[in-house]
Curated annotation (Swiss-Prot):
Gene: klp8
Organism: Schizosaccharomyces pombe (strain 972 / ATCC 24843)
One GO cellular component, as annotated: cytoplasm
Gene3D superfamilies: Kinesin motor domain (3.40.850.10)
Keywords: ATP-binding, Coiled coil, Cytoplasm, Cytoskeleton, Microtubule, Motor protein, Nucleotide-binding, Phosphoprotein
Domain Kinesin motor residues, every copy: 5-356
Protein family: Belongs to the TRAFAC class myosin-kinesin ATPase superfamily. Kinesin family.
Subcellular location: Cytoplasm, Cytoskeleton
Protein name: Kinesin-like protein 8
Sequence positions that bind ATP: 107-114
Membrane spanning stretches: none
């Protein structure tokens, strides 16, 4: 067990061509010896700054390492090699010892986060350097301990709008389907990770590079905001499993450790959106970055009853070990030398993150005899898999039962409505058929109204017509005027009614 704070490194990018052309003011001063960065308010003041009530003058922040902008002509300024030397060896050593490790990049758009992680041709970043170093160290361990078996596997993902996407799945860009199986899960040895991703065993740095190229093609670049800022967080996960066999006792010890390199999504400049809203603190721009800042603030708060909002986003759920858990963590904060608001916020949160304490342990299983170890591992793996499948089946069953109940209620309502319509149509049909088979004719030759019936008598109609005999006499004159209309009134066709009923039955099958 070891206790250590999150290690925070700040890297200042050089001025951009646009900043140089505008002679933008340099607001940062880097003291690499004392490991501090001082930010000075711009000459035009802080009238429109969101930090105007927080800053009165130059402010100095202390970190574990500080790198000034790199320049080819100066050997004193940092480059990719310097950044790796201050981070990579510690990560490689930790993961091979069995400790979980995490490397996080943090900062605004265009400050060099992805460049620091991946690099360019001839200027490799953290991942290519670590890939080379880790296999070199594995070769040394195998030569030193021939009875040690070591495997390395990797996975790559991108978290976009609270949804993890597998970057090593074929055709991921065309389907745009995240897959229901990818979610954050805690493993008994390697801690919180994205479960359900494609995981591939690799044997060299070249193989890792090939998978990185595949992932780069699958990154969903269309999901970015209007300023071109990519909303996704890239997650590179490397798992090292070691099986160390004691040649005397034939007992073995299994170690498992996970290195996660997380390139956080960029946040756009506050001045390009709304100067009164912080690009760090506004959840409307990127919910997960906002939650991350709240987690950092809660972990470093002096209050004891503060709730840590890990569960408020997928990103912070994944980072539970990295921030305050079983992990050795390094944060690389990349900042701009000319932007006051976002640079000040980045430095402020990064200095706070440096106070977060992690307690890390070597991840190992109890030793078993090699004769039984494989069988026990298989049983444990099967049980874990069965438990997970049972949990997912229960969730699916609940959703299915709810869906079936909704469908049942909907169809009961439809059946009731159709039965009502059917009863009305039957009544209509009976009246129409009866009127067709038993037509009535009134003889108005004299003043006494007489009823003539054709066909077989209908007793019900007789009784009803007799009750209205007096009224019919008083309406003699009116009925005489419409006599001709009664003779011309069309008789309902039974075939037409049958057709309407059949049409209604077919319509109900489509529901």
């Amino acid at each position: 067990m070891s206790t250590a704070n999150v290690r925070v490194i700040v890297r200042v990018r050089p001025k951009s061509l646009r900043e140089l052309s505008k002679s933008a003011e340099d607001l940062l001063s880097v003291d690499s010896h004392n490991k501090t960065v001082t930010i000075t308010p711009p000459k035009h003041g802080l009238k429109h700054s969101r930090h105007k009530n927080r800053v009165n003058g130059p402010r100095t922040f202390a970190f574990d390492e500080c790198f000034a902008p790199s320049a080819p002509e100066s050997k004193n300024l940092s480059g990719q090699e310097d950044v790796y030397e201050s981070t990579g060896p510690l990560l490689v050593k930790s993961i091979l010892e069995g400790f979980n490790s995490c490397f996080i990049t943090y900062g605004q758009k265009g400050t060099g986060k992805t460049y620091s992680v991946v690099g360019l041709r001839g200027q490799p970043g953290i991942i290519p350097h670590i890939s080379e170093s880790i296999f070199e160290e594995i070769d040394k361990l195998k030569k030193k301990s021939p009875n040690t078996t070591i495997t390395v596997s990797i996975s790559l993902a991108e978290i976009i709008e609270e949804t993890p996407y597998d970057l090593l799945q074929p055709n991921v860009n065309s389907s745009h389907t995240p897959g229901e199986t990818v979610f954050v899960q805690k493993d008994s040895l390697t801690g919180y990770h994205l479960h359900g991703l494609s995981e591939f065993e690799v044997g060299s740095a070249q193989e890792i590079d090939a998978f990185l190229r595949l992932a780069a093609k699958n990154i969903r670049t269309e999901l970015s905001d209007i300023s071109g800022v990519r909303k996704g967080h890239s997650v590179f996960s490397l798992v090292v499993q070691q099986r160390i066999i004691d040649p005397k006792t034939r007992h073995s010890l299994k170690k498992a450790s996970r290195l996660q390199i997380i390139d956080l999504a960029s946040f756009s400049k506050g001045s390009q959106r709304n100067e009164s809203i912080s690009s760090f603190e506004s959840s409307s721009n990127n919910k997960s970055l906002s939650v991350l800042n709240r987690v950092i603030a809660a972990l470093t708060s002096k209050k004891n009853d503060v709730l840590i909002p890990y569960k408020d986003s997928v990103l912070t759920t994944l980072l539970q070990d990295a921030l305050g858990g079983n992990c050795r963590t390094i944060m690389l904060t990349c900042v701009s030398p000319c932007d006051f608001d976002d640079t000040f916020s980045a430095l402020r949160y990064s200095e706070a993150a440096r106070r977060i304490k992690n307690i890390s342990n070597i991840n190992c299983k109890e030793a078993y005899s090699t004769n039984n170890e494989g069988e026990l591992d298989d049983i444990l793996t099967t049980l874990e898999s069965d438990r997970e499948q049972l949990r997912r089946h229960e969730e699916h069953s609940q959703k299915l039962l709810k869906f079936i109940e909704e469908i049942r209620n909907d169809y009961e309502e439809r059946i009731h409505a159709l039965e009502s319509q059917n009863s009305a149509l039957k009544a209509h049909l009976r009246l129409a058929v009866d009127a067709y088979l038993n037509p009535l004719e009134f003889n108005f030759d004299d003043k006494n109204v007489k009823l003539k019936e054709f066909g077989s008598p209908n007793i019900a109609y007789k009784q009803e017509l007799n009750s209205f005999q007096g009224e019919l006499s008083s309406l003699f004159k009116d009925l005489k005027l419409v006599k001709s209309q009664l003779h011309d009134y069309p008789k309902p066709e039974v075939s037409d009614i049958d057709m309407d009923m059949e049409s209604l039955r077919h319509d109900s099958l489509l529901d």
